[in-house]
């Protein structure tokens, strides 16, 4: 592993050791915690290791990582990160900017392979009647337009909100799916994506 940096060697060995000992790989966040780096930093190390030929990722398998060098006898298949889970989304910044990313999460293959896919953690009960609960992970495909009736993520005054989209003659109407709450009517909402899936951890 002469072409890997010392940190990259440690990351590669940590993944291999974890799979051998536990039967499953560490998460991006666990890699970051292990080495005192951010989730994005851990992800960057994985991509650098891939470029040097030690691992191969497969986009149609939620970024499965196959170890190629020095591990042929183990034939390990490591499922690592899937899509970025965003924290606060700031107006004016690229939606997938590094500072927005909290960690990477694995999701079903048919969702992870869609271009521009990211995840947001649902806060509150404004969409509960649509089966979307507080704490759920909303899987979003990046888009700046929407059709009436689609569930979208819209940015309003630096706050991301998940609502049902409707276009009115002179404004946008964002409807909750909670009878206790009123629709939001605004001219200043920015559509950043539409809901394509929901991920719930029990």
From Swiss-Prot:
Task: Using the record, list the residue span of the signal peptide; answer none if the entry has no such feature.
Answer: none
Give me the positions annotated for DNA binding. 28-47
Q: Which Gene3D superfamilies match?
A: Umud Fragment, subunit A, Winged helix-like DNA-binding domain superfamily/Winged helix DNA-binding domain
> What family, per the record?
Belongs to the peptidase S24 family.
- The site feature described as Cleavage is recorded at 91-92
Q: Which Gene Ontology molecular function entries are recorded, alphabetically? A: DNA binding; serine-type endopeptidase activity
Its biological purpose: Represses a number of genes involved in the response to DNA damage (SOS response), including recA and lexA. In the presence of single-stranded DNA, RecA interacts with LexA causing an autocatalytic cleavage which disrupts the DNA-binding part of LexA, leading to derepression of the SOS regulon and eventually DNA repair.
Disulphide connectivity of cysteines: none
Task: List the catalysed reactions.
Answer: Hydrolysis of Ala-|-Gly bond in repressor LexA
Name assigned to this protein: LexA repressor
SUPFAM superfamilies referenced in this protein's UniProt entry, alphabetically: LexA/Signal peptidase, Winged helix' DNA-binding domain
């Amino acid at each position: 592993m002469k072409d890997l940096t010392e940190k990259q060697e440690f990351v590669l060995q940590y993944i291999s050791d974890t799979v051998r000992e536990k039967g499953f790989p560490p998460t991006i966040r666990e890699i970051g915690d292990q080495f005192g780096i951010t989730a994005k930093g851990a992800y960057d190390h994985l991509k650098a290791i891939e470029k040097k030929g030690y691992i191969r990722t497969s986009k149609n398998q939620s970024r499965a990582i196959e170890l190629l060098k020095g591990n042929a006898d183990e034939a390990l298949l490591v499922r690592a990160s899937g899509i970025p889970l965003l924290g606060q989304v700031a107006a004016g910044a690229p939606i997938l900017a590094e500072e927005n990313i909290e960690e990477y999460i694995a999701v079903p293959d048919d969702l992870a392979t869609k271009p521009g896919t990211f995840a947001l953690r649902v806060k509150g009960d404004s969409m509960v009647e649509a089966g979307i609960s507080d704490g759920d992970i909303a899987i979003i495909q990046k888009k700046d337009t929407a059709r009436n009736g689609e569930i979208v993520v819209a940015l309003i005054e630096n706050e991301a909100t998940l609502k049902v989209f409707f276009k009115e003659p002179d404004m946008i109407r964002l409807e909750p799916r909670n009878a206790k709450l009123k629709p939001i009517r605004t001219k200043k909402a920015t559509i950043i994506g539409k809901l394509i899936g929901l991920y719930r951890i029990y």
